[in-house]
């Protein structure tokens, strides 16, 4: 689960920045798209030709996927990824940011089973 933290329009392109990274969902950097769904704060009626969804690392390989002719994603909207993350606990580097929260899907929804790391966790 990642959240949209910023959007930028650059020329004809719409860049959508998430608080997640490709390290979180594809540590081998092989996939071009993911099984995903969107949790929107409000229904968007404006469709955008192309939206490039990128991670928070600002590295050129941190491009997650591109949406074509889809409703505009806005700050606060969330992306729920499915069938990813099996190796991210062991392969994600502590580069640029600490380990993210880990959620467990339960019968009643989602439960946080590990909070995002802080400096104190790194010093253990």
Residues covered by each model-derived region:
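Charged (often Lys/Glu-rich) extended helix/loop segments that serve as interaction or gating elements
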Residues: 1-124
């Amino acid at each position: 689960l990642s959240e949209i933290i910023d959007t930028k329009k650059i020329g004809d392109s719409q860049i959508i920045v998430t608080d997640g990274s490709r390290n979180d969902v594809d540590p081998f950097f092989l996939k071009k798209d993911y099984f995903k769904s969107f949790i929107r704060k409000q229904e968007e009626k404006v469709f955008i030709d192309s939206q490039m969804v990128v991670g928070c690392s600002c590295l050129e390989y941190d491009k997650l996927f591109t949406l074509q002719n889809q409703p505009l994603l806005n700050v606060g909207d969330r992306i729920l990824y499915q069938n990813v993350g099996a190796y991210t606990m062991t392969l994600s580097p502590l580069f640029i940011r600490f380990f993210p929260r880990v959620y467990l899907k339960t019968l009643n929804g989602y439960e946080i089973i590990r909070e995002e790391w802080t400096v104190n966790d790194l010093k253990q």
